[in-house]
Each structure stands twice: as C-alpha cells, then as structure tokens.
C-alpha cells in the first residue's frame, strides 16, 4: 500500500519481533535452527529505524524443551509439512528452536537497540504455541502486552522482524483486534513462506485494516 509520509508521534511504538539467533541465517558462530531466508539483511535497517522511536518493545520466542510446536515432540512427524490437532486448533510443526537458555534463543547480538523498554517472552508454556505478541494461539490467554501499551498511552504500533507470515503477522492482527492502529514495515521483515502463507496473511491484513508500508513512508 502506498501511503503519504507519516510523522512519528509520542504515542507510537516499534515492535521488533523475534530477532533471535535461531531465526537468522547461519553464521560461523551459530547455525539457525529455523532460519528465515534474508533475515539477517533487515538487521541494519531495524537498528536505524529503532533509533527514531522513543518506545521500542522486543519480543523473544522462549520455548521449553519438548514444546508442542516441535516436530521432534511428535514421533514420526516432520517439520514444515506436518501438523497436529490441538485443543486450540491445528498446529504447524517446526524444527526445535529458541529453546529456553540456549544460544539459539538469544536475541542476535547485531540487534543494537539499547533503549528498548521491554523484552517480552512468549511461547513458554509447553502445551500451547504463541505466534502473537499479544495472545497465545488459543486467542484467549493474554501475554500482558496490550495492558503494558495502554498504560503508556501507546496507540499506534509499527511491526518489523521475523517472520512476516507468522509471528509478525499474527501480532499485528491481534493488535488490531485489540484496538491498536497497526502498521507492518514490509521492507524490515521476511517470510517463512510456506505454501499460501504470505497470501493468507496479506488477505487477513486487508480484512483487519492492518496497513503495509515501508521505511520510506515514515
């Protein structure tokens, strides 16, 4: 979507979603367990943009060992292609990733946002996943982020990070459903791009009035 240049205001916040080592392409120091292609390319832009925001929230996937979303927790199942039925719906299975207190769960050291006000950990309950920064995948259990933002009168939210078609997208959709104005910075996110996942999230954005823009628009 093409927008006029937006002026940042005191009630804006930048949400940087899951810029963790396991989601980034492999480096000599670490092999990303669930690497999103091109994820490392957005790091410099995120750092530059974050410096323009007074309020920045970082999110961090924080899974226990044997998490329900791990294919390895379901004998005979394979990541990316297999799913399992759960009380909260169909769960896509992934490689084990962002396991609590492991290097892969760490925020990438190239992410330089010293003024970030909050690091929100999600997905830490073994039997339910949490793509969204606002609600777990049952769309009922809150993470507390909405209350945190409302207490600070932060009403317009800009989203970047990983991955566009999952954690970034679900966060923006839930934020919009909770009454926030939500905008996704398409040039500062990358997609996992499972079959149909990008077109599906774009359709959901349009229905929810989540706007898509680039850094040049702000």
What kind of region is each of these model predictions?
Residues 1-123, 151, 155, 177-181, ...:
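Active-site acidic carboxylates
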Residues 64, 126, 165-166:
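Glycine-rich nucleotide phosphate-binding loop and flanking beta-alpha elements
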Residues 69, 130-133, 170, 195-196:
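Short, well-ordered secondary-structure micro-motifs
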Residues 96-101, 134-138, 161:
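Short, surface-exposed loop/turn motifs that are enriched in glycine and acidic residues
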Residues 113-152:
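Histidine/lysine/aspartate-rich catalytic loop segments that bind and position anionic ligands
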Residues 168-178:
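Short Gly/Thr/Asp-enriched flexible loops that form oxyanion-binding sites at enzyme active sites
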């Amino acid at each position: 979507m093409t927008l006029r240049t937006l002026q940042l205001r005191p009630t804006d916040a930048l949400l940087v979603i899951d810029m963790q080592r396991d989601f980034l392409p492999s480096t000599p120091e670490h092999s990303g367990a669930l690497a999103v292609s091109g994820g490392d390319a957005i790091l410099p832009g995120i750092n530059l943009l974050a410096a323009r925001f007074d309020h920045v929230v970082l999110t961090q996937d924080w899974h226990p060992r044997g998490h329900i979303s791990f294919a390895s927790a379901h004998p005979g199942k394979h990541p990316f292609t297999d799913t399992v039925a759960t009380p909260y719906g169909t769960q896509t299975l992934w490689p084990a990733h962002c396991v609590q207190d492991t290097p892969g769960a760490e925020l990438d050291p190239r992410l330089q946002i010293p003024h970030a006000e909050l690091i929100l950990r999600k997905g830490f309950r073994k039997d339910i996943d949490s793509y969204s920064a606002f609600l777990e995948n049952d769309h009922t259990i809150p993470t507390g982020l909405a209350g945190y933002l409302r207490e600070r009168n932060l009403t317009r939210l800009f989203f970047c990070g990983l991955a566009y078609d999952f954690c970034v997208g679900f966060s923006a959709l839930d934020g919009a459903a909770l009454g926030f104005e939500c905008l996704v910075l398409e040039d500062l996110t990358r997609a996992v791009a499972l079959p149909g996942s990008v077109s599906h999230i774009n359709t959901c954005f349009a229905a929810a009035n989540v706007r898509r823009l680039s850094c040049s628009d702000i």
